[in-house]
């Protein structure tokens, strides 16, 4: 049966990203948020929110939901109003559309006919429906009706690592497979007005943005037709951190997606991440975490700061994660793929020798509900100038 499997590791062959056109400037967002939610009388809470926004290190975010949508659906701004139907009616349409935009960019970079796509993986925590966003995205792209689809709902911020893990397994165990993996989240699922009793909501309103990212994954790239690897996916792993139950979560309720985020998350991640690294890199003989490149989900500034401090990382190791956080906020599952895209583009622009900032080996981390950690050991490829 070995002839049915590919030889060699799977690689990322193309990356595409997409965001809604509507832009939220972080400095202006506290005034905007309290105005559109008719909460300007809550002056003390607004000042708390302004401090959260100021500390976020976010410059701007993209957001599908605009004032016109709020005028059409005025109940969305109320804190506990039953608005799930209105949110889902928007998101079951918009999530596949934004995902399709990212896919189209990845397919264009790949340069091959879309008829060569054999598998489609889609993940989103924004909506749930049957048939799912995978079905609608495939239809929008005009993919073959025989494309093998996988739909994963409610993974959250670690989902970017999950789609790479599954795409790698599919590509390596099905010779000739080309897997289109998509992450898309639109935060209209959790937008609502403020409450003095719900400070976790304010954190979510301050950091989350909308985005989609797509990658094409395959083994044995066919260079004769122009396929070029960007990163090799060497190994993968997933773990639930000890004593972390209830620290990150989301719950679908009549008011939409209710978000949980405990203040101990940065500490939990920083205290446990080295164990994940040791398990991943001991077989390769690497123990210097400054000798690898980092593709890290920037869940928030505090997570990056704590990990950097704990592992004594050089300040440039999270430059791509910090850039994506600044320009887009936390886009849930797609964010880490934005970081991957930023890394390979910056490496080229700065004349680095590899797609991994001049380093051969690297790691991709996603953190999310559970508290779950996804990690992928990644190998860069030389850049030919």
UniProtKB/Swiss-Prot annotation:
**Entries under InterPro entries matching the protein:** Chalcone/stilbene_synt_C, Chalcone/stilbene_synt_N, Chalcone/stilbene_synthase_AS, Polyketide_synthase_type-III, Thiolase-like
Its lineage reads: Eukaryota, Viridiplantae, Streptophyta, Embryophyta, Tracheophyta
* Record bears the keyword Acyltransferase: yes
Class in the EC hierarchy, top level = transferase
Question: Which Gene Ontology molecular-function terms are recorded?
Answer: acyltransferase activity, transferring groups other than amino-acyl groups
This one is known as Polyketide synthase 3
Q: Per UniProt, which keywords does this protein have?
A: Acyltransferase, Cytoplasm, Transferase
Task: Please list the GO biological process terms of this entry.
Answer: polyketide biosynthetic process
């Amino acid at each position: 049966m070995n002839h049915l499997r590919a030889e060699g590791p799977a690689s990322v062959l193309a990356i595409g990203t997409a965001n809604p056109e509507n832009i939220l400037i972080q400095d202006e967002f506290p005034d905007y948020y309290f105005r559109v939610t008719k909460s300007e009388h809550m002056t003390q809470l607004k000042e708390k929110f302004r401090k959260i926004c100021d500390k976020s290190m976010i410059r701007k975010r993209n957001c599908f939901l605009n004032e016109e949508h709020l005028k059409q659906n005025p109940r969305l701004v109320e804190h506990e109003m039953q608005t799930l139907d209105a949110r889902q009616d928007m998101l079951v349409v918009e999530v596949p559309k934004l995902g399709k935009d990212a896919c189209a960019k990845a397919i264009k970079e790949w340069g091959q006919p879309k008829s060569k796509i054999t598998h489609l993986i889609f993940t989103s925590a924004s909506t749930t429906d049957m048939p799912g966003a995978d079905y609608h995205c495939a239809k929008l792209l005009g993919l073959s009706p025989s494309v093998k689809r996988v739909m994963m709902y409610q993974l959250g911020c670690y989902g970017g690592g999950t789609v790479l893990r599954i795409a790698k397994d599919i590509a390596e165990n099905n010779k000739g497979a080309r897997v289109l993996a998509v992450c898309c989240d639109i935060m209209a699922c959790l937008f609502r007005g403020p409450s003095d009793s719900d400070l976790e909501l304010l954190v979510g309103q301050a950091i989350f943005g909308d985005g989609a990212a797509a990658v094409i994954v395959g083994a044995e790239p066919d260079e004769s037709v122009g396929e070029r690897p960007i990163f090799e996916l060497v190994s993968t792993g997933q773990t639930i951190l000890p004593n972390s139950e209830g620290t990150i979560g989301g719950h679908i309720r009549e008011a939409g997606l209710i978000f949980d985020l405990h203040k101990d998350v940065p500490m939990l991640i920083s205290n446990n991440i080295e164990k994940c690294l040791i398990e991943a890199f001991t077989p390769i003989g690497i123990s210097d975490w400054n000798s690898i490149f980092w593709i890290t989900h920037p869940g928030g500034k505090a997570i990056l700061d704590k990990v950097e401090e704990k592992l004594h990382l050089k300040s440039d190791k999270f430059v791509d994660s910090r850039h994506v956080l600044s320009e887009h906020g936390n886009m849930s599952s797609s964010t880490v793929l934005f970081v991957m895209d930023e890394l390979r583009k910056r490496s080229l622009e700065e004349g680095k020798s590899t797609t991994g900032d001049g380093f051969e080996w690297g790691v991709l981390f996603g953190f999310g509900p559970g508290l779950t950690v996804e990690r992928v050991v990644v190998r860069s490829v030389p850049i030919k100038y």
